[in-house]
Amino acid sequence: MALNSINTNAGAMIALQNLNGTNSELTTVQQRINTGKKIASAKDNGAIWATAKNQSATAASMNAVKDSLQRGQSTIDVALAAGDTITDLLGKMKEKALAASDTSLNTASFNALKSDFDSLRDQIEKAATNAKFNGVSIADGSTTKLTFLANSDGSGFTVNAKTISLAGIGLTTTSTFTTAAAAKTMIGTIDTALQTATNKLASLGTSSVGLDTHLTFVGKLQDSLDAGVGNLVDADLAKESAKLQSLQTKQQLGVQALSIANQSSSSILSLFR
């Protein structure tokens, strides 16, 4: 190729190629700064983009898991609250039965104690029946178990129901006494019911702790997934900012180089003057 030619300006061609390359890099850096992402679409890096999208979907699905587990927590909390009420009522029922077992009582006092006992018994059934969260109960005998979401793959966390209604703790809606001797026998029956109720509540407490632990794990897992996606696609803005300044300087120099190269043709004309 001729070093001095008016048909082909090799220097200008090289300068233009370099300038175009710089402009392309500059556009990429500006896009990363504007979006905050180094991988904004599949054309930037298909493999990484696909991985990030899949991980983002998994992280987002964890919200449904957390919602389900939180419903589980609330369902158990309501049952435990009802259980506290029921154990308190059982304690009062034992007190009434013990007092009624006193053979020295007159009929009016005995009947008053029996009436109080029956009222306390009925309150137990009401407490168990109303122990619902969002229409769901694990305390009233309406279900044997509930399964909540445990992971994004649809696997479940199962909580076994614990019936703490009268039937669930060995009593009936007609459990009562009509004599001092029957009241004395009822004391043992109430003790057994109280033990049954506390055992069931302890089991629910264990399930609640398990839900709490798993919910904490799911939250940490979601945070880790979000961080992993960020590592894959987020731009290092400090690095990109420094690169932007460097490319802007390089662009200015490229424009000057192209201008100088374009002047070479004019220099050839001066040889013929």
Swiss-Prot record:
GO MF entry, a single one: structural molecule activity
Instruction: Give yes or no: UniProt keyword Secreted.
Output: yes
> Where is the protein found, in the record's own terms?
Secreted; Bacterial flagellum
Provide the alphabetized UniProt keywords. Bacterial flagellum, Secreted
Q: InterPro entries this protein is in? A: Flagellin (IPR001492), Flagellin_C (IPR046358), Flagellin_N (IPR001029)
Whether Secreted counts among this entry's keywords is yes
Looking up Gene3D superfamilies in the UniProt record yields: f41 fragment of flagellin, N-terminal domain
Give the GO cellular component terms, alphabetically.
bacterial-type flagellum; extracellular region
Q: What does this protein do?
A: Flagellin is the subunit protein which polymerizes to form the filaments of bacterial flagella.
On subunit structure and binding partners, the annotation says:
In C.crescentus, the flagellar filament is composed of multiple flagellins of 29 kDa; 27 kDa and 25 kDa.
Assigned protein family? Belongs to the bacterial flagellin family.
| Descriptive protein name | Flagellin FljK
Q: Which organism is it from?
A: Caulobacter vibrioides (strain ATCC 19089 / CIP 103742 / CB 15) (Caulobacter crescentus)
Its taxonomic path starts at:
Bacteria, Pseudomonadati, Pseudomonadota, Alphaproteobacteria, Caulobacterales
